[in-house]
Amino acid sequence: MESQYGTQPPSIAALFVRQARSAPERTAVRGEDAELTYRELDRRSDHLARRLQDRGVRPGDVVGLEADRRAATVVALLGILKAGAAYLALERRYPAERRRLILADSGATVVLTRDDLDAMAEGSAPDPVETAPDDVAYVAYTSGSTGAPKGVRVPHRAVLRLVVDADFLTLGPDDVVLQYAPVAFDASTLEIWGPLLNGARLDVAPERDLAIGELTEHIHHFGITVLWLTAGLFQQVVEYGLDDLKGVRVLLAGGDVLSPPHVNQALAALPGLTLVNGYGPTENTTFTCCHTITAPVEGAVPIGRPIRGTGVHILDADLRPVPDGEIGELYATGDGLALDYLGNPEQTSRAFLPDPFDERPGARMYRTGDLVSRRADGVLDYHGRADRQVKIRGFRIEPGEIEAALAGRDDVAEAAVVAQPGPDGGKRLVAFVTGHGGARPATLALRRELGEVLPSYAVPSHIRVVDALPLTANGKVDRAALTADTSPARPELNAEHRTPAPGIEAAVAQLWSDHLGIDGIGADDDFFELGGHSLVGVRITTDLEREYGVQISPVTFYLAPTPAGLADAVVQAGGAR
């Protein structure tokens, strides 16, 4: 593939500086903590780069960052790049053990905390640094099948290929792009650098979880014109109502399979909207293919064509091209490819292969593990995974990592993790475990201990103890049987079962049953012990808002995570008992 950016500056920071000099007084970023012009963002990131250099950070180093949704975080990202280093975003919600593993694996020389960022607001200009297109811009950790997360090293070239002269999205000075994805999630690469490298404005959403009504109100109030939503969040926004999105020019959605009925509803409600299905793994920098949806869809939504700067091969098991219409595995090529898995040459060599169809020295292709077919017009259709990897709420998960964590427990003999269909149309993780000698591991303790080493999205919604795992005829675990083995039974919980009181308490419990797919929920049952998570919490609070005319923040689930507690919150907010 030919590089698309030609005479453009070779790095993210250099291209940003060009934008800052061309329109210094234009607003660059707005967040709850600050609103900065391009000149101010340039100056503050210079100061932070200088402070990092004074602390011994050198070109090529990795700098860890507690990445909240704040304007100060954007200053830090740019400052790290100006120092010639690569950023490693750390979500504050990550368990301490996972953060420790990631930091140790990355070799980060410095870790910036929220307090550090506030203290580095002033300073002097940094020493100039020459950054090449193939220097590392950031390290993103993904789930690993062996039980350890993998660090993906993404170069500046790959980010520029995504946001400079893109053919799936045009950004300009009149655009306002929302950053809602966590910085550690690769969708933020588009959300942050898309506007800042094209002279647009970046709007950083509040740090807290937002109810759907709060999110759409924010989109309307701050004049968002471009936004990215995961497939699950897109579905919720469509179900809530699209009136607040009438000012949105482009809506990109993906991270999982899009629901055709919701796509069609959005197109009908927002006739001026450009709706794009975006597909791509972290190893190919956010997007590999995009499909602009221009008409109502029947059947599955395609993933489209490769974006500019990207090529694809559809190959069989012997790396031979398959004919149009036949299913093969997707391999990606071009400027978007990551450099490697940090410190993991074995996994790198398995995933990043020499491209046999490109004669240029060093040409590579990335094995995505996704099965696709190509239509006669070049559009690609998605047909699932070739391996066991799954996506839950937009996050890529290797069930093997969870199984390894479970197998490390003394009381677990065997473990298998599968993705089952959830009651809301998405997927949820369910773990099946056996105990030694007929003993029954405590599932509540297992979920709690998994939460200490895995991110919340990788903790199974349910853990079921079985006498034995089912096997196929050749003696392998029958994962298809486990996927089909759904049960609405109430899991083991700390609380004794108490029947909900008639009225709001019973209505809340029923709402939980509907959204969690569990029968017999008690008044004192804990939402998170039942397998609830923030996205389900947002759905429930949205339903309560409609039913009782009150606004309940999703944060309430952390403060009062039971039907009884949530019912009291509804009453206190003005809902009738």
PLM regions and their residue ranges:
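Amphipathic alpha-helical regulatory segments at dimerization interfaces
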Residues: 18, 105, 265, 269, ...
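Phosphopantetheine-attachment site and its flanking helix in carrier
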Residues: 46, 70-81, 397-401, 506, ...
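Motif- and composition-driven signal specific to adenylation
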Residues: 72-78, 85-103, 126-324, 329-338, ...
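Phosphopantetheinylated carrier protein domains
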Residues: 274, 409-412, 458, 533-561, ...
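Conserved small-residue
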Residues: 19, 84, 199, 334, ...
